[in-house]
Amino acid sequence: MKYIVMQDAFFVVLLLVLAVPLGIYMYKVMIGEKVFLSRVLEPVERFGYRLMGVSEVGMSAKRYAVSVLAFSAVGFVFVMAVLMLQGFLPLNPEGMKGLSFSLAFNTAASFVSNTNWQAYSGEAALSYFSQSIGLTVQNFVSAATGIAVLFAVIRGFIWKKQKTIGNFWQDLFRVTLYILLPLSLILALLLVSQGVVQSFADYSVVETLENGAKQLIPLGPAASQIAIKQLGTNGGGFFGANSAFPFENPSSFTNLIEMLAILLIPVALVVMFGRAVKDSKQGRAIMTAMMIVFVIGVVAITISEQFAGPHYQGVATSGSMEGKEVRFGVGGSSLFAASTTAASNGAVNAMHDSLTPLGGLVPMFFMQLGEVVFGGVGSGLYGMIGFIILTVFIAGLLVGRTPEYLGKKIEPYDMKMVCLLILVPPLLTLFGTAVAVMMPSVQASVSASGAHGFSEVLYAFTSMGNNNGSAFAGFAADTTFTNMVGAVMMLLARFIPLVAALYLAQNMAGKSSVAASSGTLSTKNGMFIGLLIGVVVLVGALSFLPALALGPIADFFTTFK
């Protein structure tokens, strides 16, 4: 246990050390300031703008939102076409056939919405062309879209009496060129150096040591996709077993760098926020609130997996190892599970369905909080800003003052947008779960009975309704109902809060700042951090406690039989 504590502490310290300079760098990218890569990338940037016919004129929230939706719609159609027609496309050495309409629809919606829910196994269903040209490209642009929208939201708070919130095409291109591509290149090279595959060769047939049996070894351009799947909080694995598969995550070192990659940009964006609003204490307050909830979750999962699993007389074990890789152990698996669900990533290095009841409850609850404990790149922080405004509003009601945040007064219109930001994901999750449990096809998809069977359904629709993408593997997802309903849920959960955030940003940008007074609520001290954590957890608890009581909580009490 001491080793696990030291490992987790080292991870958090290293994460913060890396995130601070990256956050400062991203702030310079956001405001268009020159960075050390400018000499190399500026000509590429100018050429890209000319090629796309992009002007640098600012956009209103409506125009920004239309641009996001149109760009995402084109990506959706392109990915769906690639998946259904992959049998006729190149880079298909294994002769993979096109996906069914419902599965292609679900997969396209999943990757366009930055969810990466996978109702298929990559090595058995997709060609190299589909993986690299279809899905990997969407991993980049869906992540860049989230960060671009966050840029617009931040401008809403730092600009005064403006009618625009930036230019989507410029934000999208700069994020991709200056942030995602360089980081992905570095991470991909690191992964390849450690044995992660990157090849367009045919699958290999090898003779095993047991009876000389033949085994097919899948290959592919995995490292390049894994790099952006982690950095962009996408999470979709090149192989079906995701980061539990040795070709994706072969060692403890790759496990460390993949976990760092999951949280690096979300944490750095908080640093960037503090720099952008010219008050680093604001960023530190948000970081502290997120980190407290995250650390509590890591501790809860680790203790549950280390001590709450089955014990057998005379057998010395290092915790519950069912569904876990020996090379990662309880510590590496628990930290990964917390990171991937706190950050809206969804990649897994252990099977979450095999976690103990309380060990599975924490990742589920992280998602149900709205993916704001770091959350997805961009979307996590603008979701947390929604909770901050809600907290300020509640505190203002308690003392009878007009609430304000960063010098901007909070008005009824702002609260309407915040409600859309906060309430859409839980409504989709609970509605989807309620409908699903009544469907015979979903009932047949569940591998377990009783409380754990309900947990499998609840986890699946929580994951899709909050754009995470992880799953309890006992849930058979490739059915027409789950594919179609899940796709609609993922798209709504992504784009309704996104559009609400843009309109919130424009309304804020049009206001002038008000001077802080002695009665202004401080949003950077310990009291506010406690209030913010309380509001985030309370909204999650009120929304999901009845469902959790029927699922993982009831599952926990069945272990005492």
Swiss-Prot record:
Keywords: Cell membrane, Ion transport, Membrane, Potassium, Potassium transport, Transmembrane, Transmembrane helix, Transport. Belongs to the KdpA family. The gene is kdpA. This is Potassium-transporting ATPase potassium-binding subunit. One of its GO terms (molecular function) is potassium ion binding. Pfam families: KdpA. It is found in: Cell membrane. It comes from Listeria monocytogenes serotype 4b (strain CLIP80459). NCBIfam families: kdpA. The system is composed of three essential subunits: KdpA, KdpB and KdpC. It comes from the Bacteria. Its main location: membrane. HAMAP family: KdpA. Part of the high-affinity ATP-driven potassium transport (or Kdp) system, which catalyzes the hydrolysis of ATP coupled with the electrogenic transport of potassium into the cytoplasm. This subunit binds the extracellular potassium ions and delivers the ions to the membrane domain of KdpB through an intramembrane tunnel. The chain crosses the membrane at residues 4-24, 65-85, 133-153, 177-197, 253-273, 285-305, 380-400, 417-437, 484-504, 528-548. InterPro entries: KdpA. The keyword Ribonucleoprotein does not apply. The keyword Glycoprotein does not apply.
